[in-house]
Amino acid sequence: MAAKLTRLHSLRERLGATFSSHPNELIALFSRYVHQGKGMLQRHQLLAEFDALFESDKEKYAPFEDILRAAQEAIVLPPWVALAIRPRTGVWDYIRVNVSELAVEELTVSEYLAFKEQLVDEHASRKFVLELDFEPFNASFPRPSMSKSYGKGVQFLNRHLSSKLFQDKESLYPLLNFLKAHNYKGTTMILNDRIQSLRGLQSALRKAEEYLVSIPEDTPSSEFNHRFQELGLEKGWGDTAKRVHDTIHLLLDLLEAPDPASLEKFLGTIPMMFNVVILSPHGYFAQSNVLGYPDTGGQVVYILDQVRALENEMLLRIKQQGLDITPKILIVTRLLPDAVGTTCGQRLEKVIGTEHTDILRVPFRTENGIRKWISRFDVWPYLETYTEDVANELMREMQTKPDLIIGNYSDGNLVATLLAHKLGVTQCTIAHALEKTKYPNSDIYLDKFDSQYHFSCQFTADLIAMNHTDFIITSTFQEIAGSKDSVGQYESHIAFTLPDLYRVVHGIDVFDPKFNIVSPGADMTVYFPYTETDKRLTAFHSEIEELLYSDVENDEHKFVLKDRNKPIIFSMARLDRVKNMTGLVEMYGKNAHLKDLANLVIVAGDHGKESKDREEQAEFKRMYSLIEEYKLKGHIRWISAQMNRVRNGELYRYICDTKGAFVQPAFYEAFGLTVIEAMTCGLPTIATCHGGPAEIIVDGVSGLHIDPYHSDKAADILVNFFEKSTADPSYWDKISQGGLKRIYEKYTWKLYSERLMTLTGVYGFWKYVSNLERRETRRYLEMFYALKYRSLAAAVPLAVDGESSGN
């Protein structure tokens, strides 16, 4: 007998049924929530009350517990409690319960946000509020619906659009036109005007194929280019007879029986990318003596490693395509007249280890000029004028439009958006970190944050960039859609409200095929396993021993380790609240057994100069206070930020020699470049479970996870690691080798650059032959930028030389 199909009950019906069957118990629970008064409750608070009330009889209330475990927050406005329920990643429902009347109702996104706004303004529900909704523009656009498709946008897009575009022979004409449009600075590539039809193309390809099989495979393409021009085929098919034949054969197969995999492979072989612009305006962007400066950390390292790998891949592909073209990559950042001992005041700087990559610095232009560093939170009033100046400088340097513009972080992504819009080129977005995730409730309680951080500008810029861009690169799945228990960075922008400014009812779709996971790696010339003894930089060992163990206290290192035979707990990060270096020190200080097992060495901040960053100043004070409170002298070494990456690589390996571990204790880490660096050196790594490291590390196999919000448990995990490693040294080796295996499989710059090149080709193609430009969305964004962002940016105070800048 066939199984009977039953209707899925709505969330309201399920909750209503639970209230009907257990009214007294649920009244008691929701009354506990209401008795806490007006405000917000987080998931752990909701579950704590449930556990306290039903600890002895949980099974009975399992269906309701499932709902509660999916709740991410609750808004309490007595007698109402509203819940934001996330049954699975990227999917949200909203309900509201009246505790007095036992009434349950479902809410729309707009209704839930309006209810939430009453936390800060009891009259909010009566006001007309601008609502931002991008969903109508994407209603007819293809999107996957399974969570396994997150971050695999290009594969999905190829499958969907291939079937649509290649329905019949006539549908292939856009591909023909795309190939004919290929040129570089006026020089035609791939096809010339001799080919006017698909039949003509196929005929030319077959004639070319017949010729190619008659000559040696290693014949240089330069020997038959002239013959091929007469057929209608220009340069760009390959550098040898074999490679040209492979490319032509691939296209013939596509024309006969199109399929998405062949299309992606073909687009990866034809010349499409010669000039790339990478934007990273804020901070001190240079190749040396800057790491550890305010707003200057992993993003700088990421970009410098990225361009080296990308240039190598571009040169390789250009050679294999049989072209004589010199590529160009420009990293565009702010020129700082007050360069404080760095090269940040130099307009053009060659990137070491490259042939065709430069750092191009463009100053922020104001009426009176501005010389000093400006916090990344204060850059918004300068960016529109900056974009105009950058556009002029790019044309001066490149003499042509770039093929790809890559934005980094919120400011770089906004400038990339304005440039891509102006020049009509493909745009790639890399967030690194979306601040809305790092500062919980910074949207609803905007008034508490905005004067210091100007999040109204930043969140607006983020929305504009993520909806304008052609494709988004993330380092991890978590960036897009989080995990079962935590909300992803981009996912947090689906719906939120900025009271008195606007309400976002649909800000981004995490199922959008523009999302692609492309994970970076570490520079393997700098970071390599400690076991590769012939490559070890032993010349640095005396300096490293001085750094770690000398009895001298100075501006580079504070406090002295009394027992150098212990393994080292090592951590290196910026000194800010989210990186949680002070939290690591407190966790260590509170656990006497951990202090007995290992020394603590942290690299953070700069003892030699007074920070201009207010958050860093506060962390400095807290660090000294904790060291005093927990009597850590003799157990801790606090080292100033280290600028020498090459020596830092050997420092990781030296910590391996002590059988130590690297700990990354951040409250949230978007990716975790230091995690990758440490693992690449073979140093066992124990890192936060919030953000990218949760994905990089397979817990117990390639490292360990800790939760910085539960520091006592985190300390116990460290204790257990060192106890097991002492009792059985093979355990330390197992975690070390597991980390290296994970790196080689997933996190290398070679894999990254290959994927980025392919993505650029595929998205560029689909943008040309379809409505992937999303013109309607871009018109909407133009209005939002002009009418909302500009006024918000204008309200941010301009910096004045001589005054402190920082947050």
Curated annotation (Swiss-Prot):
Q: Which GO terms describe its molecular function?
A: sucrose synthase activity
Q: Which InterPro entries match?
A: Glyco_trans_1, Sucrose_synth_GT-B1, Sucrose_synthase_pln/cyn, SUS_EPBD, SUS_N
Q: What is its EC number?
A: 2.4.1.13
Q: Does the keyword Glycosyltransferase apply?
A: yes
In which tissues or organs does this protein occur?
Highly expressed in developing endosperm and in roots and, at lower levels, in coleoptiles and aleurone. In 3 day old roots it is detected in cap cells and along the vascular strand, starting just after the meristemic region. In 9 day old leaves it is found in the phloem. In seeds it is distributed throughout the endosperm and also found in the assimilate-unloading tissues, the nucellar projection, the vascular area and at a high concentration in the chalazal region.
Catalysed reactions, as listed in the record: an NDP-alpha-D-glucose + D-fructose = a ribonucleoside 5'-diphosphate + sucrose + H(+)
| Biological-process GO terms, alphabetical | sucrose metabolic process
Spans annotated as GT-B glycosyltransferase: 272-748
Keywords on record: Glycosyltransferase, Transferase
| SUBUNIT field | Forms homotetramers. In endosperm it forms both homotetramers and heterotetramers with SS2, all three possible heterotetramers are formed.
Which family, according to UniProt? Belongs to the glycosyltransferase 1 family. Plant sucrose synthase subfamily.
| Biological role stated in the UniProt entry | Sucrose-cleaving enzyme that provides UDP-glucose and fructose for various metabolic pathways.
Protein name as it appears in the record: Sucrose synthase 1
Report the source organism: Hordeum vulgare (Barley)
**Annotated gene:** SS1
